[in-house]
A protein has these predicted regions:
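Generic structural signal for small/hydrophobic residues in well-ordered secondary structure
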Residues: 15, 51, 71, 99-101, ...
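Short amphipathic alpha-helical segments
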Residues: 12-13, 95-97, 140-143
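Conserved glycine-rich beta-strand-loop-beta hairpin in the small C-terminal domain of fold type I
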Residues: 48, 52, 68-82, 90-104, ...
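PLP-dependent enzyme catalytic core of the Aspartate aminotransferase-like
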Residues: 109-111, 115, 119-128, 134-183
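Surface-exposed helix-capping loop/turn segments at secondary-structure junctions
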Residues: 82-91, 168-174
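Residue-level recognition of strand-loop junctions within catalytic nucleotide-signaling folds
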Residues: 20-21, 56, 102-104, 147-149
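Short, solvent-exposed loop/turn elements at beta->coil junctions and helix N-caps
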Residues: 2-4, 87-88, 131-134
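Conserved core segment of the aminotransferase class I/II
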Residues: 1-69, 79-81, 164
Length: 183
């Protein structure tokens, strides 16, 4: 297990493992893990302290993940707002902490999704991750987390919508100009 998902500490890269049963049966395995952690990994000391605090303190995760909890409300809001943007389709996740919207390639003819995401960041100050960053084969998806509070999500998705509107208009003009030139 780890802190990233259960305790909302993305980036901490701190986790733990429990081995149960007869220790003699797994002694070589444990020795191998210890050797690997000594050779290739470096202990995340602040993260180790965070584990102790997370496991021993108030377990707010139960309130957060309740059927009507904050994460469900934020997921529903992000899903609703993203679905309202023209040319964007999205599946509502049942267990993930993010959406993976698809952009209609006819409305958003993206050639380089890294540049597309960089432009969004530069123009609207919203950071997303391009779909190809998750081995998606086409430049028509991006990932957006719905962990921020509702007000922050509303503002971020409003900015995404503005960026996408400008992108659609810019590329619609190019298509219109090309059609006029052919006539």
């Amino acid at each position: 297990n780890g802190l990233s998902k259960n305790y909302r500490s993305c980036g901490y890269r701190s986790g733990w493992m429990v081995v149960s049963g007869d220790k003699a049966m797994v002694a070589d395995y444990i020795e191998g893990l210890n050797m690997l952690s000594s050779m290739r990994l470096c202990a995340n000391v602040p993260g180790q302290y965070a584990i102790q605090t997370a496991l021993g303190g108030y377990q707010s995760i139960n309130d957060l993940v309740a059927k009507d909890g904050r994460l469900a409300r934020q997921r529903d809001l992000a899903y609703k707002l993203m679905s309202e943007i023209p040319g964007v389709t999205v599946t509502k996740p049942k267990a993930a902490l993010y959406l993976f919207p698809k952009l209609d390639p006819d409305m958003y003819p993206i050639k380089d999704d890294q540049q597309f995401i960089a432009d969004l960041l530069k123009e609207e100050k919203v950071l997303l991750v391009q779909g190809t960053g998750f081995n998606w084969p086409h430049p028509d998806h991006f990932r957006i987390t719905f962990l921020p509070h509702e007000d922050t999500l509303r503002e971020a998705i409003k900015r995404i919508a503005h960026f996408l509107e400008r992108y659609r208009n810019k590329h619609a003009l190019k298509k219109g100009a090309a059609a006029t030139a052919k006539a």
